[in-house]
Structures are given as structure tokens and as C-alpha cells.
Amino acid sequence: MKEQLVDVLCDVQKGAADKTSQTGNVIVMGGRETGKTRLISSLIPAICRELNIEASKVAYIFAEDLNGKNIAEIASKLAGGFLVIENANQLSQETADELDEVMNGNTKSMIVILEDEKIGMRKLIARYPKLAKKFTSMINIPVFTNDELVNFAKVYTMENGFRIDQMGMLALYNLIGINQKEDQPMCIGTVKTMLDNAMAKAQGGLFKRSKKRVDRDGFTVLLEKDFS
């Protein structure tokens, strides 16, 4: 993942020398709820730092909402900025052709980022190969292992003032294992929902007891029963 991000930053820097959007554009793909949009929102400031841009115009739009719009007008408003197209596989032929044409012109190096799930993105690349050639770097968000998801859980809960005890950790491992399927692997979004539910359950229980479940560092402890 780190290598992919480094490659993107290098590629974007090369593309910035040209005032068009013919190169230096990015594809971001991954499974459902794997944090694609969140990654993009962090990637854009990183690109701005790489290009020494203090601030830049950014627009997020779903492909189905972009269809039928005046792409040239949108690109003019976003000149030198970022156009993020979500669910990119829904782009119509007409919109894809117009976008391709606009990206050949002077966009002041506007960067276009396409986002979709892997299957959808592969369909788009196959359907619009001419447009796809302009996307010279790609971030493929990997499927996370159980250990990686649990490590995320540790960080996420601590950021929210909670800590998972040993039995709670075993319960979380078990919960992830039960829900981890080959055709639909567990993702960060699903684990986050599990943790939000556990934290809400623990927080609700605090008002029913005179003594709070707080450790020496001030973290509220999540127990096995909070994950049931």
C-alpha cells in the first residue's frame, strides 16, 4: 500500500509539468466499505504538498450525477484542482467521451480520480480503454487479514477513549472470523460498525454502575460481553 502511494505521488508530479490532464490521473479501487473515499480525502492534501500547492479546488461527484452534465464547464471551474468521480463504472459513453476530450485540453493540470469497487473499475477500463490510458497510476486497496483488522480495532478504540481487554480481543477475533467470507471479505467499515456498537453498549452500561470500567490510563475497557 505504501509503495502504491509513493508511485502515485511520483506520477502526479511528472504529470504536473503538462497543463493538460492527459497523465497523472489516479484510479482508486477496493471492496465495499474499504475506506476508498477516506483514502482519497487524505491523498489529495498529500498531492498538494508534493506539488507545493497551498490549497486547491476539489469536487466529489457520483458518476450517475455527472452523466449529462457539461464536463467542459465543470473542468473550467476546477482548473488546477481535483475532480473525484465515485462509482465511476456508472459513467455513460457520452460522458466518458466528453471527459476524455476535455482532459486533452488545458485544464491547468487538473487531476481526475476515479473511484469504484474492483469489479466495476475493471468493467470501466475494458469499456473505455481510451479514457483509461489517461489514468497512469492506481491504488488497489487490499483485502485485510484478521490480524490487520484487529490491529485497526486497537487503534480505533483508543482514539475514541476505549481499550479492549484480553477476553474482549478474543471475542472480536471470533466475531471477525465468523463474518470473514471468501466471496465477501471483512472490511474496515464493518469492523468499525462492530466497534461502534461495542463502545455504545459499554457506554450505556456505565450509567447503571457506580464504578466505571476505566483503566489506569483513563481508557474505558471493552469486555467480552460488549461484543455479544
Please report, for each region that a protein language model flagged, where it lies by residue.
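Pre-Walker A (pre-P-loop) alpha-helix and adjacent loop at the N terminus of AAA/AAA+ ATPase modules
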Residues: 1-24
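A short helix-turn-beta junction within AAA+ P-loop NTPase domains corresponding to the substrate/partner-engaging
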Residues: 126-143
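An amphipathic alpha-helix signature
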Residues: 6, 146-154, 169-173
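Conserved alpha-helical scaffold flanking the Walker A/P-loop in AAA+ ATPase domains
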Residues: 65-105
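C-terminal alpha-helical "lid" subdomain
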Residues: 156-163, 170-228
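Walker A/P-loop
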Residues: 23-56, 135
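AAA+/P-loop NTPase substrate/partner-engagement loops
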Residues: 46-78
